[in-house]
Swiss-Prot record:
PANTHER family: RIBOSOMAL RNA SMALL SUBUNIT METHYLTRANSFERASE I (PTHR46111:SF1). HAMAP family: 16SrRNA_methyltr_I. One of its GO terms (molecular function) is methyltransferase activity. It comes from Micromonospora olivasterospora. This is Ribosomal RNA small subunit methyltransferase I.
Length: 313
């Protein structure tokens, strides 16, 4: 692959601009690698800082240069674009690292959203870190978190999965490994596979609560909420399913129950050790965990037997 040629003037950010698009190297002698999010639907998703960085850097590495060129035209960004995708990631990373070492600032973008999130870029970032090249990730649009916060699903703990395997057997095997995960699960899926994917989710994980986010941040953005079987049935009636989907699924109820039982056991032991009355312990544990009355009573009984009798039981 030919080397990357620089052929335009840019404004320097942290250093002095050169006519070839590079800047005077900083004290470390290298440029900076910027990871720049782009819109996931609405063009207004992009940040002012992202626009400033993209206008300034010497090179922008893009998953699809045609797509990025159209975006840059709308934002009046004149940038040197080079391709960076799954098929040239290794060789292009070496070239870009060479430019960074020479003092050129480089920005990495994906077609939509935040770079490296289900997109290429890991090799370049890892190489930059290894070479002590500064890496600056910019905050911005990402479909996974946007869908999560609008889903109504628990968001204190979540597991980003991305795309599942295309073939049913491999897809179900991957889901089986996730079956006991307590965290909310986040997936991406294409419109022509979404119905089959939802059916497999229900078959392997059970009929859990879920939310489908379609065409996030676009004018026709839509959230569909319900249980997996219900959502599968709703999409089956669409003659042609359209849109890009982010799927948010509740975590394992069994795993949450295990966590609640473990918490109840620790809480019971602590209260017994501090001499609390059995009646108060039962009330506190049930209020905190929501576990069944009979189970809580039995735990309190066992704990008090181990530590000696308590009054007012």
């Amino acid at each position: 692959m030919a080397s990357i040629q620089l052929a335009r003037t840019t404004r320097g950010g942290d250093g002095v601009a050169r006519a070839d698009g590079t800047r005077q190297a900083d004290e470390a002698g290298s440029g900076t690698l910027y990871l720049v999010p782009t819109p996931i639907g609405n063009p207004g998703d992009i940040t002012l800082r992202a626009i400033e960085v993209l206008r300034r850097v010497g090179v922008v590495a893009s998953e699809d240069t045609r797509h990025t060129y159209r975006l840059f035209q709308s934002l009046e960004i004149d940038a040197r674009l080079v391709s960076y995708h799954d098929h040239n990631e290794e060789s292009r990373s070496r070239q870009l690292l060479g430019l960074l070492r020479e003092g050129t600032d480089v920005a990495l973008v994906s077609d939509a959203g935040t770079p490296l999130v289900n997109d290429p870029g890991y090799r370049l970032v890892a190489a930059a870190v290894e070479a002590d090249v500064p890496v600056r990730p910019l905050p911005g649009a990402t479909a996974s978190v946007t869908a999560l916060i609008g889903s109504g699903m628990p968001n204190h703990q979540f597991h980003y999965v991305g795309f599942l395997p295309r073939k049913e057997a491999a897809r179900r095997a991957a889901l089986t490994a996730l079956r006991s995960t307590p965290a909310t699960l986040i997936f991406f899926e294409a419109p022509h596979r979404i119905v089959a994917m939802l059916a497999d989710l229900a078959a392997v994980l059970g009929d859990r609560p879920a939310a489908l986010a379609r065409n996030l941040t676009k004018d026709d953005e839509e959230f569909l909420r319900g249980r997996l079987n219900e959502l599968t049935a709703r999409l089956r009636v669409e003659q042609v399913v359209r849109g890009q989907f982010t799927v948010v699924v509740a975590g394992s109820p069994e795993a949450h129950a295990d966590e609640d039982r473990a918490l109840a056991a620790r809480l019971t032991e602590t209260l017994v050790r501090h001499g609390a009355e059995a009646r108060l312990i039962r009330e506190v544990v049930r209020e905190v965990t929501g576990l069944p009355r009979n189970w809580v009573y039995e735990q309190v009984r066992l704990a008090t037997e181990r530590s000696g009798p308590l009054g007012n039981s």
